[in-house]
Amino acid sequence: MYHKMHNYFNDSTVVRYESDVISINYAKDTLTIKLLDKFIYKRKKIVYMPSDRNLVAMPELDKLILTNKTNLQSFTFDWLNARNTFDKSHKLNLLDLDMQYYYDSTEQIYKDKIVHSNGKTYDISLYDASSGLQSITPIVLMLHYYNNQYFNDFEKFTSYEKQQELQQLADKIDSIFPFPTHNEHLDSTDSKSYSQTIEHTGNVFLHMEIKNKRKKMYQQLTTPYTTDFIIEEPEQNLFPEAQEALLYWTLEEIKRGNDGNYLFITTHSPYILFALNNCLMGGLVKDKVSNQDFSSEKGWIDVKDVSIYEIHDGKLQSIQDNDGLLNNNYLNQANKKIANE
């Protein structure tokens, strides 16, 4: 299965999900899907960055064939699509590390490059870079691209096969919103002619309304409006200070994107949580502080926009206090475990 979850299912497994658009229920090996409101759905781009993301450093990754339809395959395709934007003339800054990434299509094998910002100190392949850089680079690149530029490039990369699929979808939408029929032969009598003219005029406006509905539904089903980012273990191979810097930059980047963009992070790192709490606290006190410099400031966010949970004994529970900040007991316990060790 796509997320490799099939081995976690048994005869007693129950899965329920409901949104404004769809209801999904899985029980007793039976899957039931109901559309609640098919007219409000807006397509999203989902970008999943797995813990295996370091594979982007592999030479000739574009020649690697992933036969199984897994999240790793989707990640690889998204990476290959996004990296083309950052050529030698459009290098990508990697946080505040004085390093940049660029893609060199002229290279035969090592096409992904890391260069010092001064352009002189070194110019190496991503394959030869540290594991930390190999972990950070896909996060920074894909967040930067799919947060903004992707929406401008979307139609440019539509293949012929995809265009055929879209035409089939357009035909399906036409069947949902059919045009009304009307009598084209107007009667010779004034009263009937007038009546039929009114009917025809009404149909014209109705046709316009139907065309607008068709267009709106087609756009909502085919054109991505927002991106859902899912990052697995952003702390991977990073020193605590680098984890903090990455979290601050990630939140800053999300704030710059389209309204409705969504970020989901899974983590085992207390440093990621501490950094997130700094941004939540900054969001609460931003109107009360001035003339002070905080490294987290560009990542400050509203506590109302954030939910934080942990899985404990198989149950999902919130670890936020009433003010939206991380629970002090939770932070203290995490800190004590590290200090006591």
Regions found by a protein language model. Give the residues of each.
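P-loop NTPase switch/coupling surface
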Residues: M1-G119, M217-T222, D259-G260, F274, ...
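Switch/communication elements of ASCE P-loop NTPase nucleotide-binding domains
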Residues: V115-E341
